[in-house]
């Protein structure tokens, strides 16, 4: 399955080990992680070589090609929220995961849309 992994990049990289774990887990299960750059420890340096438009177009292209999204939402991020909304609009199923004691938005926790789920993990 083609998976879009969403996680905070500019909002903070504290969850990087978690993104790397999720990416590795999905790949080991035979899934293709299109947005693997989220789990790349060098992503900020690599993205500094791209324009904002190039980053947006790349990510939206990955999302368009995805069969589902996994969004790590423990770290508040406008970008992750935008990607989740974009996936919902495109009819792409979304699973949001978060660590215990995370302050997850009510916009996710209270969402009753059938193709979005929020799960505690860790």
From Swiss-Prot:
EC identifiers of the protein: 3.2.2.-
EC class name: hydrolase
Highest taxon listed in the record's lineage: Archaea
One of the Pfam families matching this protein, by short name: Nuc_deoxyrib_tr
GO molecular function: 5-hydroxymethyl-dUMP N-hydrolase activity
InterPro entries assigned: 2'-dNMP_N-hydrolase, DNPH1, Nucleoside_deoxyribTrfase
Gene Ontology BP annotations: deoxyribonucleoside monophosphate catabolic process; nucleoside metabolic process; nucleotide metabolic process
Swiss-Prot/TrEMBL keywords: Glycosidase, Hydrolase, Nucleotide metabolism
Catalytic activity as recorded in UniProt: a pyrimidine 2'-deoxyribonucleoside 5'-phosphate + H2O = a pyrimidine nucleobase + 2-deoxy-D-ribose 5-phosphate; a purine 2'-deoxyribonucleoside 5'-phosphate + H2O = a purine nucleobase + 2-deoxy-D-ribose 5-phosphate
UniProt: substrate binding residues: 4-10, 19, 37, 83, 105-107
Subunit and interaction comment: Monomer and homodimer.
Function: Catalyzes the cleavage of the N-glycosidic bond of deoxyribonucleoside 5'-monophosphates to yield deoxyribose 5-phosphate and a purine or pyrimidine base.
Family the entry assigns: Belongs to the 2'-deoxynucleoside 5'-phosphate N-hydrolase 1 family.
The name this protein goes by in its record: Putative 2'-deoxynucleoside 5'-phosphate N-hydrolase 1
């Amino acid at each position: 399955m083609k998976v879009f992994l969403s996680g905070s990049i500019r909002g903070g990289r504290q969850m990087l080990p978690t993104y790397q774990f999720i990416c590795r887990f999905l790949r080991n299960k035979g899934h293709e992680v299109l947005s693997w750059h989220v789990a790349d420890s060098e992503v900020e340096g690599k993205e500094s070589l791209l324009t904002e438009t190039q980053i947006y177009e790349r990510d939206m292209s990955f999302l368009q090609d995805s069969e589902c999204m996994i969004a790590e939402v423990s770290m508040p991020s406008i970008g992750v929220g935008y990607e989740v909304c974009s996936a919902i609009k495109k009819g792409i199923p979304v699973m949001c995961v978060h660590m215990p004691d995370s302050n997850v938005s009510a916009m996710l926790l209270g969402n009753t849309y059938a193709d979005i789920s929020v799960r505690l993990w860790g």
